[in-house]
């Protein structure tokens, strides 16, 4: 698949931008700070309705506006789909397909599949566990969009359960009524948590071999990459040739919650569940976090994203379904050998979008099509322009000020 056109309005620093794209490789070229990353973030969001950079949609809307809009024309073989997403922080996104009426947001998932690698992905190796959990959950939803509801249900129930625990902290009012209410939330938490755990473990089982192969390809096989899932739910721990059943995971989670009841009351916090879990990464026998060199960290983070790409390709073997691959400011950080190896790995994608500040950083075979991104005299960002996507987003009238 590929994206032939992208239009954004009030997204990040962009008041309005319109970009024509082609199959094959495209380099978005421009100085640091002109908005290259904002454009590829918009492409990723159009497909997943999630940013690869931030967890809050509010940060995606241009300052002073109440919504942002992204539209694109997606091609999969002979089929073309016009997809539009309106980002409304604090509310559900509005999604339209082929200029039709708005549909449920989840119906827009899967039309455009993307895999994005960006410098922020170093935190997948060096950062806190939340980033690695997010990686698993994003891939899980791309594979099975319906599981997005399980993740949302889990977060909602977790907030309610924590609120109940906090309401009884240090209070003598905790009694049979509170116990009964907590038991109800336990059931909801275990039901949603078990589905989320099952989805994550399924993703990890699919990732294991591609992760090893991609890291070996990027580093010439210097060390073996591996993982272990460290869970507060004992049945979910380790690596799994077979994923435990949802019912078994729910039973084990319920049992563990009961064992932690007094500690949870004392701390007014839910201590058991997928929100507390960790994906531990290893290079050889050593944990990657804290032990990997800078080059190894880059290679492992890249291998994680490229392995995710392989998982999506295997999920739908139709060549026309291969995700769009986005490499955001990657090549400047790689030595010549790693650049060559990465360039050799991306050829399977029908479309590769690369951002760079200097063209010489990008392997020549990936520079077939170039788009210059700049800032005009007024400070607003400008890109190569073409006709809007089916008229979905029109350039707004200027309002007296330029955007930085």
UniProtKB/Swiss-Prot annotation:
Residue ranges of the region described as Disordered: 379-404
Localization, UniProt: Cytoplasm
Main location per the UniProt record: cytoplasm
Keywords: ATP-binding, Cytoplasm, DNA damage, DNA repair, DNA replication, DNA-binding, Nucleotide-binding, SOS response
Pfam families reported in the protein's UniProt record: SMC_N
SUPFAM superfamilies noted in UniProt: P-loop containing nucleoside triphosphate hydrolases
Function: The RecF protein is involved in DNA metabolism; it is required for DNA replication and normal SOS inducibility. RecF binds preferentially to single-stranded, linear DNA. It also seems to bind ATP.
Assigned protein family: Belongs to the RecF family.
Protein name according to UniProt: DNA replication and repair protein RecF
Organism: Micrococcus luteus (strain ATCC 4698 / DSM 20030 / JCM 1464 / CCM 169 / CCUG 5858 / IAM 1056 / NBRC 3333 / NCIMB 9278 / NCTC 2665 / VKM Ac-2230) (Micrococcus lysodeikticus)
